Regions:
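Sec/Tat signal peptide C-region and signal peptidase I cleavage site
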Residues: 18-23
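Von Willebrand factor
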Residues: 24, 28-32, 45-176, 179-181, 188
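Bacterial N-terminal signal peptides that target proteins for export
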Residues: 1-9
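Acidic/histidine-rich, surface-exposed loop or edge segments in extracytoplasmic proteins
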Residues: 43-57, 141-150, 224-229
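VWA/integrin I-like adhesion module and closely mimicked acidic/polar interface patches used
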Residues: 27, 187-232
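Bacterial N-terminal signal peptides
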Residues: 9-17
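N-terminal post-signal-peptidase region of extra-cytosolic proteins
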Residues: 63-71, 163-165, 203-211
Length: 232
């Protein structure tokens, strides 16, 4: 691996170990195409994985592992991922995007044929390292959120508002395949509803959510939920 690509790997390692003020706002994974100074770049990702974790839903170690396994299964080339958390608690901890990353697409055969042979090895190594560090970043971030989760029957939690907030971001993303992976027990506890009270009329609550504009449109994204119904 040449010095330039070695520096990229070092940068990735540094990013995994240190907090970044801009983390989550931009792509936190440096580009192998840019590092190689090619005249072309990787196309936009055709897949989006948006992981949204409810900090008011503590999970067992087995379910935490299931979250990580599902993330790993969904990540691959040409994939953009977002790791975010939410929970309105006593310290005003609302929705926060912790990391956004892109695993780039490999070069097409036509592109490879126009790249000097001595540059291909370094690029291929960089792409392997990029995928490894992207998965490691997603896993570590998700694990930190899961391990810090706390739950209590009266803990404030605006699940519908969190979903409403991320919906436009997901809907407007140009990826052809979009997935929202929600980790939550689904117990809304806000000015809108208090599931712990046990006195809810589902049809009435659905109508109220519609009236208050709390129903989210994810633009055709698939939505998967892990943890539904788990009590704190």
């Amino acid at each position: 691996m040449n010095k330039r690509l070695s520096a990229l790997v070092g940068m990735l390692l540094l990013m995994l170990g240190l907090p970044c003020a801009r983390a989550g706002l931009v792509n936190d994974i440096p580009s192998c195409y840019a590092a190689s100074h090619f005249s072309f770049s990787s196309p936009l990702p055709n897949r989006l994985l948006y992981v949204l974790i409810d900090q008011a839903t503590p999970l067992s170690p087995a379910l935490q592992k299931s979250v990580i396994d599902n993330i790993n299964h969904a990540l691959g080339p040409a994939t953009k991922f977002v790791i975010a958390e939410f929970s309105r608690t006593s310290n005003s901890h609302y929705l926060q995007v912790l990391h956004t990353g892109i695993i780039e697409s490999p070069m097409t055969p036509s592109e490879r044929s126009n790249v000097p042979v001595n540059a291909l090895g370094g690029f291929d190594n960089c792409m392997r390292d990029q995928a490894f560090f992207a998965i490691h970043m997603a896993d570590t971030t998700a694990q930190q959120i899961l391990q810090a989760a706390t739950g209590a029957p009266n803990q404030p939690n605006d699940i519908l508002l969190a979903l409403k907030t991320v919906a436009p971001v997901i809907a407007q993303d140009p990826a052809r395949q979009k997935v929202l992976f929600l980790v939550s027990n689904g117990f809304e506890n806000s000015s809108f509803a208090h599931f712990a009270s046990g006195n809810l009329n589902p049809e009435q609550m659905l109508q109220q959510a519609r009236t208050q504009g709390l129903l989210a449109n994810f633009g055709g994204a698939q939505v998967f939920v892990l943890g539904a119904g788990i009590t704190p």
